[in-house]
């Protein structure tokens, strides 16, 4: 990568705006450091009052207590801050910041700030802090007289212009007038700092011995430099650079004497350090130099333009965008921009050719056109050659500068670098500090956008997703200076943050999005990370259109954003949910645990309830001797509902036989074998043994000989499962008690779960009460909450006992058979004869209707059957019955269609009314 190092302080600036006018007027060759502190605030007084504060009653100027201020100034000098100023680092002071406010521009007078006079022997540089304000009345008369000379000199050369009338104006005419006035005052009031770097063709001795000659002329009378001599590089680039003011080696004296044209070159034309005390430098926002020896890119190399990578083109684009933003916002940074632009045009060689002229006046083209700069930048050539350094012209070797290398700014491509794009305000101020954020904030989105990058709705980042389709042209530009609303999108004044307004949604567009197919995501191509910043290095460099096919109907559809902020309602892209299945209400109450030996010691049991839709843990159940439980549940269930109750840490008693008594050879006295005792021990035992003691030891030996059973408490776990399909008919509309086995945890899958079945691996039985209520068209808050409450409400439902019997003819397959039929409530029982064999049972579910006989064949009518009945069962079976008289058929229809359930009078519960209607 080619790098060229350059200095912005090598260019000569005489193009000053209104701010530069005041700076040049207040700069004097023989001035001391600026006072660190002043009393009062200049922003609170008018220009006339500020002028009065600088003078005594007799008209003498007052500059404050210099002895006290010199102490503070010397403290700053001890910090060795001269090198910072010599390298061009400015400092924003209070007077500079206050000039940019609208109410202070007109009130600020050019005579409101004066610098302390400094002797020529001290040679101090201006201090780092400068604050405008009122002065006290204890200053010396010398400072006031020299300050008055400045005003007198200005009024002498500009009799028609009043210095107090000069104010900051944005108009072009006032700016040009300020430039013309500043050209003389700048040359008249050069500070000692500006003599540290001289013109390449002016002798240093002549400059130091004849300081009056430096103020004899003005900048517009400068002579051009011959093309055969190269300009001298800045002093800070030389190998012999030191800290402090630097003076370039003077040229041979005969160079100036042989060429009389060069005698007209003034001292003010020297390459000064481009520093003014009241105009701090604003560094150009460029990316730092990085090692990019291994190029990387997320776009094809064929799409990269060399002109976009070159230093000269990139610099001009940056300057053009800075100029456009500062002019549009009304700021007064035009002079600083022109200085840098003129230097970039003068200091660097282009196309291998040396400049034959060094223009030191940038006021000739003080208002460059932005379009001209951009067009010229596209015509630059030979800037991307793989040359890391270029040698300095030979003319510099005679001056003792050695080999100096010009470094260039980074050459990596902005669109392919792994950077985080920042948000910039209208003034171009940078709000982040990543590698290329400075340039990305200055350049617009068109300079950095690639077809693979698109602003995603609903995010706070302009580039936060990797789009699968080509971005819409209407959404590429989000920059706007004013807040506006377009189709539900509110753009903030920062120009890059867009928030979606759901109130502006159009129903037609929502329906279209709902019916469209969602954009398919390729898991290998698109990262699903939760972060907003996508790493450009991980993305493939080939074209996306050749990687996969876009689904049909999604060409003009926006991609689904990967975001967790919730600004975008993703339900628009989802399919409509299907209608839910009819759900009933299932109530369960746990009663107790049976057939299990639970320890009498109070020990807690953990119970976990697991359903297809949820998983809950009950509080610890304190188990007593009766093993009772007390828990209620209510579930929304379908026919395939299943619930499991897992019991953990059940304490049970494990009774096992202990070790039998000791053998007969054991000594009765102490329980040890006799042969293990020593002779001395036997002697003393026999000596001190008593009869009473022998009896006690013998009784203890008998007790120890008996086998004792030890009780061990262990904890086991098991699971009890209940299926609704097994108990639905029994608990439909009424409470039903059931026992289900608790199967050991290790044998849960080996043993089938059946009601009242106890296997070898079961721990016990769980007793519970259940109740099922079908789905009713009532709100959920109207339904009972517990099984006990539902049972109390069902007591108000009265069941009507329906009964009828007789002979009817039934169509079975292809024949008609005479059967004896018995009706009990809503159930039909068929027998071969009265008191004969039972054949079938039929449960009525709907209203029974009559069938006209014209629908049947002649064979049926020939049997003497005059009426027919059609009935439907619960399982949707149909049965056809016939009678030999219309009177018998009418009686059966009346009984079958009678209500079997009725509600007691005075009952107003809505769910009971719906339940009775459902059962009827």
UniProtKB/Swiss-Prot annotation:
Name one cellular component (GO) term. medial cortex
Which cysteine residues pair off into disulfide bonds? none
Q: Which residues carry this modification: Phosphothreonine?
A: 34
Per UniProt, the short sequence motif Nuclear export sequence (NES) 2 occupies residue numbers 763-773
List GO molecular-function terms, semicolon-separated. cytoskeletal protein-membrane anchor activity; lipid binding; molecular condensate scaffold activity; phosphatidylinositol-4,5-bisphosphate binding; polo box domain specific binding; protein-membrane adaptor activity
What InterPro entries does this protein map onto? PH-like_dom_sf, PH_domain
Keyword list, A-Z: Cell cycle, Cell division, Cytoplasm, Cytoskeleton, Mitosis, Nucleus, Phosphoprotein
Which GO BP terms, alphabetically? Answer: actomyosin contractile ring assembly; mitotic actomyosin contractile ring assembly; mitotic cytokinesis; mitotic cytokinesis, division site positioning; septin ring organization
**Impact of mutating residue 718 to D?**
Disrupts the structural integrity of the C2 membrane-binding domain and impairs the function
Q: What is known of its domains?
A: The N-terminal part (residues 1 to 452) is intrinsically disordered but moderately compact and is able to demixe into liquid droplets at concentrations far below its concentration in cytokinesis organizing centers (also called nodes); these physical properties are appropriate for scaffolding other proteins in nodes. The N-terminus has the ability to associate faintly with the medial cortex and is sufficient to form tight rings. This domain is responsible for oligomerization that may contribute to the activity of mid1 as a scaffold for other proteins in cytokinetic nodes and contractile rings.
Name of the protein in its database record? Anillin-related medial ring protein mid1
Species annotation:
Schizosaccharomyces pombe (strain 972 / ATCC 24843)
Q: Please state the gene responsible for encoding this protein.
A: mid1
């Amino acid at each position: 990568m080619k790098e060229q190092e350059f200095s912005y302080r090598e260019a000569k600036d005489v193009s000053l705006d209104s701010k530069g006018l005041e700076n040049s007027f207040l700069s004097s060759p023989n001035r001391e450091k600026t006072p660190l502190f002043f009393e009062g605030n200049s922003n609170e007084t008018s220009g006339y009052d500020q002028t009065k504060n600088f003078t005594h009653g007799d008209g003498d100027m007052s500059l404050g207590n210099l002895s006290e201020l010199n102490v503070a100034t010397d403290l700053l000098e001890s910090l060795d801050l001269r090198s910072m100023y010599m390298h061009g680092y400015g400092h924003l002071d209070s007077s500079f910041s206050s000039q940019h406010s609208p109410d202070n521009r007109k009130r600020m007078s050019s005579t409101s700030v004066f610098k302390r006079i400094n002797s020529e022997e001290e040679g101090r540089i201006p201090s780092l802090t400068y604050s405008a304000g009122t002065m006290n009345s204890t200053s010396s008369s010398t400072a006031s007289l020299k300050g008055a000379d400045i005003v007198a000199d200005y009024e002498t050369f500009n009799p028609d212009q009043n210095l107090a009338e000069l104010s900051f104006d944005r108009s072009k005419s006032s700016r040009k007038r300020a430039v013309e006035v500043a050209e003389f005052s700048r040359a008249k009031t050069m500070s000692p700092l500006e003599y540290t770097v001289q013109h390449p063709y002016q002798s240093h001795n002549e400059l130091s011995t004849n300081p009056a000659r430096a103020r004899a002329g003005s900048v517009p009378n400068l002579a051009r430099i011959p093309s055969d001599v190269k300009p001298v590089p800045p002093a800070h680039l030389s190998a012999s650079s030191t800290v402090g003011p630097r003076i370039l080696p003077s040229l041979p004296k005969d160079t100036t004497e042989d060429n009389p044209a060069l005698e007209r070159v003034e001292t003010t034309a020297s390459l000064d350090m481009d520093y003014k005390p009241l105009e701090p430098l604003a560094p150009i926002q460029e990316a730092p130099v990085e090692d990019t020896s291994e190029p990387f890119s997320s776009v094809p190399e064929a799409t990269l333009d060399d002109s976009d990578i070159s230093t000269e083109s990139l610099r001009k684009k940056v300057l053009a965008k800075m100029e456009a933003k500062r002019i549009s916002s009304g700021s007064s940074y035009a002079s600083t921009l022109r200085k840098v632009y003129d230097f970039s045009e003068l200091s660097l060689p282009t196309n291998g050719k040396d400049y034959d002229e060094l223009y030191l006046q940038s006021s000739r083209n003080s208002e460059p056109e932005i379009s001209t700069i951009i067009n010229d930048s596209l015509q630059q050539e030979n800037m991307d050659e793989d040359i890391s350094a270029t040698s300095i012209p030979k003319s510099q070797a005679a001056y003792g500068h050695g080999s100096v290398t010009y470094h260039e700014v980074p050459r990596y491509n902005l669109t392919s670098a792994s950077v985080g794009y920042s948000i910039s305000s209208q003034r171009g101020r940078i709000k982040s500090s990543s590698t290329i954020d400075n340039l990305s904030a200055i350049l617009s989105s068109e300079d950095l956008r690639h077809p693979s990058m698109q602003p995603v709705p609903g995010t706070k980042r302009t580039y936060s997703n990797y789009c699968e389709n080509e971005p819409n042209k209407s959404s590429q530009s989000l920059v706007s200076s004013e807040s506006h609303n377009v189709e539900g999108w509110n753009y903030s004044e920062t120009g890059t943050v867009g928030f979606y307004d759901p109130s502006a949604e159009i129903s037609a567009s929502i329906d279209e999005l709902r019916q469209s197919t969602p954009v398919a995501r390729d898991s290998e191509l698109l990262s699903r990370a939760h972060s907003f910043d996508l790493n450009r290095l991980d993305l493939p460099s080939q074209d996306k259109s050749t990687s996969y096919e876009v689904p049909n109907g999604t060409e003009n559809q926006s991609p689904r954003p990967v975001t967790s902020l919730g600004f975008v309602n993703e339900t628009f892209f989802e399919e409509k949910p299907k209608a839910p299945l009819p759900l009933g209400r299932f109530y369960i109450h746990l009663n107790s645990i049976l057939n299990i030996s639970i320890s009498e010691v109070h020990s807690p049991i953990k119970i976990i309830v697991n359903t297809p839709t949820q998983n809950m843990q009950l509080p610890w159940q304190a188990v007593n001797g009766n093993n009772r439980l007390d828990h209620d549940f209510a579930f929304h269930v379908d026919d395939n509902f299943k619930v499991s109750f897992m019991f953990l840490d059940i304490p049970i008693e494990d009774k096992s036989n202990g070790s039998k008594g000791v053998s007969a050879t054991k000594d009765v006295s102490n329980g040890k074998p006799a042969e293990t005792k020593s002779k001395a021990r036997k002697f003393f035992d026999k000596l001190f043994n008593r009869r009473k003691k022998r009896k006690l030891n013998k009784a203890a030996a008998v007790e120890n000989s008996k086998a004792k059973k030890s009780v061990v408490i262990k904890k086991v776990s098991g699971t009890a499962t209940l299926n609704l399909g097994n108990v639905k008919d029994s608990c439909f509309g009424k409470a039903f008690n059931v026992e289900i086995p608790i199967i050991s945890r290790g044998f849960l899958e080996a043993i089938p779960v059946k009601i009242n079945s106890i296997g070898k691996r079961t721990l016990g039985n769980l007793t519970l009460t259940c109740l099922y209520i079908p789905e009713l068209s009532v709100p959920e808050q109207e339904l009972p909450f517990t099984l006990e409450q539902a049972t109390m409400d069902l007591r108000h439902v009265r069941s009507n006992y329906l009964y009828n019997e007789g002979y009817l003819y039934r169509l079975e397959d292809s024949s008609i058979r005479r059967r004896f039929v018995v009706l009990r409530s809503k159930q039909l029982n068929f027998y071969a004869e009265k008191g004969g064999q039972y054949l079938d049972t039929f449960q009525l579910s709907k209203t029974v209707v009559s069938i006209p006989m014209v629908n049947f064949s002649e064979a049926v009518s020939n049997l003497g059957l005059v009426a027919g009945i059609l009935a439907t069962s619960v399982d949707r079976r149909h049965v056809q019955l016939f009678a030999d008289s219309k009177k018998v058929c009418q009686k059966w229809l009346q009984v079958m269609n009678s209500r079997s359930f009725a509600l007691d009078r005075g009952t107003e519960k809505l769910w009971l009314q719906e339940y009775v209607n459902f059962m009827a």
